[in-house]
């Protein structure tokens, strides 16, 4: 009886799955806007695919993946040069499965990016596809995923690695834009509250977070110099840490320069401290992909060196921690990847709830004139609750879209590639998928993104001085 009731309860959701996004989440957020709800659903789909990709790397999945013709033959063992450890078929096939799932997600969102090009209002028929028909879209996505597992091996993995690295690098730049946007919005919000009332409280809050970010950044610099450099080696790491430290100091000084303050009174050290901390994370992330293991200890080595005695008992021989090989009970998701995924989730959620009306980066880049600024429309949803009809979110895009549908799907396409590279630790496969190694291109992609991050932030500061004819108020 309970099963029957469950079927009828599930059936009641079928109209929602075939209609707009506003029906799916109306019980949780009845007063939300359609533009926000749609983006949250797409973000949830991407996060769900990330969970599935992670599960595919688990050892328990080997039995099922080996049943796919030609996907995993004989549970072969492969030797990985950079960590001196044997990998069973489960780990390598997990990587191959992640590549397939990410391929399906990227194709799905790329096709939608093309389909949604130049959609101006929700009255466009294509907007109905974007905001609705969820059952069919999810079914199509599952179909693409299943089909991707039957793609012949060959050079697919190597080619898709290159595509993934390029896409992931572009998504890192998008994360940087969102981070700068968030930093400016956060600072402006708190400065406004400080001016409205209780200035001491908000000033103390600004000072506390700014100090905390700078202190964490200094700690990061110290740890990186201690564990990722050696007196007689690791020259690249010394250069990466030093140049990024200098650039962060320069960016912080620029943010409080009198000329900058004159044109942007609300620029300050809060944004600089957040950008500095993120730059230090990118520096660490880049060096974590360095092929030379002597210059790239893993996080467990940090803990071992800090907590364990440096001298062996009874003699004066130093205990040298060795890199910890990956566990064969699961995937190789390490601390760097976890932090990367955490930052990814925050940026994805922020991109789903932000609007062009509160975007500070839109004012500080060359895209401000294209932003659609609409007033809040909260009265149109009242009639939906009449006559027992389900409550729906407010359609706030009848006169103009709140964001570019095409660019949003393109961002999710690049995010799929970023997830692929993160879950596989940016390791590079050969053509026959017989080895997985860290490579220098991954290092340079990440370290270059840290420089672009700082350049982008500095540009948002100096733009009013350079583009004098543009309104940044």
Swiss-Prot record:
Protein name listed in UniProt: Serine incorporator 3
Family: Belongs to the TDE1 family.
GO molecular function per UniProt: L-serine transmembrane transporter activity; phospholipid scramblase activity
Any one annotated GO CC term: perinuclear region of cytoplasm
Modification after translation: N-glycosylated.
Record topology, Cytoplasmic segments: 118-132, 181-203, 261-329, 428-446
Stretches in topological domain Extracellular: 1-96, 154-159, 225-239, 351-406, 468-473
Spans through the membrane: 97-117, 133-153, 160-180, 204-224, 240-260, 330-350, 407-427, 447-467
Endpoints of the signal sequence: none
Organism: Homo sapiens
Role according to the record: Restriction factor required to restrict infectivity of lentiviruses, such as HIV-1: acts by inhibiting an early step of viral infection. Impairs the penetration of the viral particle into the cytoplasm. Non-ATP-dependent, non-specific lipid transporter for phosphatidylserine, phosphatidylcholine, and phosphatidylethanolamine. Functions as a scramblase that flips lipids in both directions across the membrane. Phospholipid scrambling results in HIV-1 surface exposure of phosphatidylserine and loss of membrane asymmetry, which leads to changes in HIV-1 Env conformation and loss of infectivity.
């Amino acid at each position: 009886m309970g099963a029957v009731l469950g079927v009828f309860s599930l059936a009641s959701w079928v109209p929602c799955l075939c209609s707009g996004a506003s029906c799916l989440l109306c019980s949780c957020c009845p007063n939300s806007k359609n533009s926000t709800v749609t983006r949250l659903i797409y973000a949830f789909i991407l996060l769900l695919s990330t969970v599935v990709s992670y599960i595919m790397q688990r050892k328990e999945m080997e039995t099922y993946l080996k049943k796919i013709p030609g996907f995993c033959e004989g549970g072969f063992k492969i030797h990985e040069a950079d960590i001196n450890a044997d990998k069973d078929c489960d780990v390598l096939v997990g990587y191959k499965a992640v590549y397939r799932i990410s391929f399906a997600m990227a194709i799905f969102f790329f096709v939608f990016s093309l389909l949604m090009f130049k959609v101006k209002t929700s009255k466009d028929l294509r907007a109905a596809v974007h905001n609705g028909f969820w059952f069919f879209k999810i079914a199509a996505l599952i179909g693409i995923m299943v089909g991707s597992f039957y793609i012949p091996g060959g050079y697919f993995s190597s080619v898709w690695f290159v595509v993934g690295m390029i896409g992931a690098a572009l998504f890192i730049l998008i994360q940087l834009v969102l981070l700068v946007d968030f930093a400016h919005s956060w600072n402006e919000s708190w400065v406004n509250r400080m001016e409205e009332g209780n200035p001491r409280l908000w000033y103390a809050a600004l000072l506390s977070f700014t100090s905390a970010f700078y202190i964490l950044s200094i700690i990061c610099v110290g740890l990186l110099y201690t564990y990722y450099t050696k007196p007689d080696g690791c020259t690249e790491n010394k250069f990466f840490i030093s140049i990024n430290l200098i650039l962060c100091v320069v960016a912080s000084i620029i943010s409080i320069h009198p000329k900058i303050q004159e044109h942007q009174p609300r620029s300050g050290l809060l944004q600089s401290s957040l950008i500095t901390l993120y730059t230090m994370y990118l520096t660490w992330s880049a060096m974590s992909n360095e092929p030379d293991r002597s210059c790239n200890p893993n996080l467990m080595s940090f803990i071992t060196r800090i907590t364990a005695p440096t001298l062996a008992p009874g003699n004066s021989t130093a205990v040298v921690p060795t890199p910890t090989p990956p566990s064969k009970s699961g995937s190789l998701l390490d601390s760097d990847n976890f932090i990367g995924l955490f930052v990814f989730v925050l940026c994805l959620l922020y991109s789903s709830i932000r609007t062009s009306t509160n975007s500070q980066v839109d004012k500080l880049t060359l895209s401000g004139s294209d932003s659609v600024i609409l007033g809040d429309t909260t009265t149109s949803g009242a009639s939906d609750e009449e006559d027992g009809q389900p409550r729906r979110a407010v359609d706030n895009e009848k006169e103009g879209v709140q964001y570019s549908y095409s660019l949003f799907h393109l961002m999710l396409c690049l995010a799929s590639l970023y997830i692929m590279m993160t879950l596989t630790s940016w390791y590079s496969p050969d053509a026959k998928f017989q080895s997985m190694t860290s490579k220098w291109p991954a290092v340079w992609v990440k370290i270059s993104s840290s420089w672009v991050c700082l350049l982008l932030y500095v540009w948002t500061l100096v733009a009013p001085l350079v583009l004098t004819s543009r309104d940044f108020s």
